[in-house]
């Protein structure tokens, strides 16, 4: 599925105007958060789509299946070296991996096999391996090396292919479990050993590269763990934290080489609080946890649970989108081809945006804005003054209508301001006149349900319906 387009975002005549409310405008803006590709220019650079970025990151066209072989699975071996006669680069001062490094490297390997058709089997002793791990401490001249971080070699049939090397003088390399940058480094170097390149033509130790050298706009940690450049270059903010698993463009890139792993999390998965994923980067146990991830999920009915945060959050369930979670910006994304059905906000003033699936959105405490989009959605505002936004007749049809499950009369609002662009809306009491742009509230006292109907201009029949648990008044509707 693509991004939810029912909020009139593809129609110039429905651009933001004085006709639409601040709640509608906040959703409209959020749906354009990190728009990419399609000829856009961002930061003075060409913007790449996910597929374009994946092609760029795999431009060497090498994998463990050979050259120019795409979408083919691979069963690989890995090894933690115990001793070496030499290091391919000429560096010296070999040190074998410590227990903490081994643990973190295995988690990095797991994060790659979660998203692509890769299996990793550890070997020991004299057995050779596709991917190897070792530390160094000195450069080729025997001097202590404090400048470099790590490096790795692409797949192939040459001496050193698939080997990865880490500077043991760096504290985040020696203790990667306590310093997020160490885990990020392991995942980055394993990416190279699997065939992924940097998004641009740069390398450590070659001049003084910067984001100015980026080939395309989305070359940052926000989009790729293979990047050199901080997430702030593309408008995100991780507040000094680092991601430790493949990001949205990395997932597309590694799947281009080895195919997508369609056995990963096929059940009902929860990401964030109350997570059942058994992955540390998908799991929050308290509000201090900085979640930085791109989700890959192969099936089931899945939930983003960000209920433990008190920050104002923006949560978008559309594939390819980014969310602002737990006080960070642009820190959670959804990989291409993934459907997340449900979202739970926290106690701040949140914006929740659904996709074309039948979503369950729960705002929680705070003054929240909920937009379900297409599909038959169930919306819970929770405590606070909440606004339920509708952008077009496609958002809640007679055949697939939304439920607003906890509406508070006189407190919550239902926002129909987007429909003003077709002409001023007016209320009718018992039946429509046929003129269009008419709204009718129908109270079902026996079941304590309000039916909200809307007949749009230019439509031969009434095809917009929202069902509301509880009674709503005309003053609760923004028209």
From Swiss-Prot:
Ca(2+) 4 binds at residues 355, 357, 359, 372, 377. The keyword Repeat applies. It comes from the Bacteria. Binds 7 Ca(2+) ions per subunit. Binds 1 zinc ion per subunit. Gene3D superfamilies: Collagenase (Catalytic Domain), Serralysin-like metalloprotease, C-terminal. One of its GO terms (biological process) is proteolysis. Hemolysin-type calcium-binding repeats lie at residues 344-361, 362-379, 380-397. GO terms for cellular component: extracellular matrix; extracellular space. It holds the Pfam family Peptidase_M10_C. Its main location: secreted. This is Serralysin C. It comes from Dickeya chrysanthemi.
């Amino acid at each position: 599925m693509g991004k939810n387009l029912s909020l009139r975002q593809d129609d110039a005549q429905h651009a933001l105007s004085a006709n639409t409310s601040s709640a509608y405008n906040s959703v409209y803006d959020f749906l354009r958060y990190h728009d990419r590709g399609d000829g856009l220019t961002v930061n003075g650079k060409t913007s790449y789509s996910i597929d374009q970025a994946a092609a760029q990151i795999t431009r060497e066209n090498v994998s463990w299946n050979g050259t120019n072989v795409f979408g083919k699975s691979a069963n690989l071996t890995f090894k933690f070296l115990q001793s070496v006669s030499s290091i391919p680069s000429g560096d010296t001062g070999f040190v074998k991996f410590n227990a903490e490094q081994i643990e973190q490297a295995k988690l990095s390997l797991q994060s790659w096999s979660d998203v692509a058709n890769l299996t990793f089997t550890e070997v020991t002793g004299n057995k050779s391996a596709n991917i190897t791990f070792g530390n160094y401490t000195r450069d080729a001249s025997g001097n202590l090396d404090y400048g470099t971080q790590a490096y790795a070699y692409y797949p192939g049939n040459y001496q050193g292919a698939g080997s990865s090397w880490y500077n043991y003088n760096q504290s985040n390399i020696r203790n990667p479990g306590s310093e997020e940058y160490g885990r990020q480094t392991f995942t980055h170097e394993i990416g190279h050993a699997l065939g992924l390149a940097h998004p641009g033509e740069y390398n450590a130790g070659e001049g003084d590269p910067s984001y100015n050298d980026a080939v395309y706009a989305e070359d940052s940690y926000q989009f790729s763990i293979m990047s050199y450049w901080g997430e702030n270059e593309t408008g995100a903010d991780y507040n000094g934290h680092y991601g430790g698993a493949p990001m949205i463009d990395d997932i597309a890139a590694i799947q281009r080489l080895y195919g997508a792993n369609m056995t990963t999390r096929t059940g009902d998965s929860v990401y964030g609080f109350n997570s059942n994923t058994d992955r540390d980067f998908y799991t929050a146990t308290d509000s201090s946890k900085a979640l930085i991830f791109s989700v890959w999920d192969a099936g089931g009915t899945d939930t983003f649970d960000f209920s433990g945060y008190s920050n104002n959050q923006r949560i978008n369930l559309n594939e390819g989108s980014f969310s602002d979670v737990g006080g960070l910006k642009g820190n959670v994304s959804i990989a291409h081809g993934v459907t997340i059905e449900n979202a739970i906000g926290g106690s701040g003033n949140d914006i929740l945006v659904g996709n074309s699936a039948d979503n369950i959105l729960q705002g929680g405490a705070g003054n929240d804005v909920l937009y379900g989009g297409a599909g038959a959605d169930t919306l819970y505002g929770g405590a606070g003054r909440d606004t339920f936004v509708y952008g077009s007749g496609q958002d809640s049809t007679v055949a697939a209508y939304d439920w607003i499950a906890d509406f508070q009369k006189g407190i919550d609002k239902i926002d129909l301001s987007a429909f003003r662009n077709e002409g001023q809306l007016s209320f009718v009491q018992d039946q429509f006149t046929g003129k269009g742009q008419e709204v009718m509230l129908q109270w079902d006292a026996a079941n304590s349900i309000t039916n909200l109907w809307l007949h749009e201009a230019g439509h031969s029949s009434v095809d917009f319906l929202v069902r509301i648990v509880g009674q709503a008044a005309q003053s609760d509707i923004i028209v």
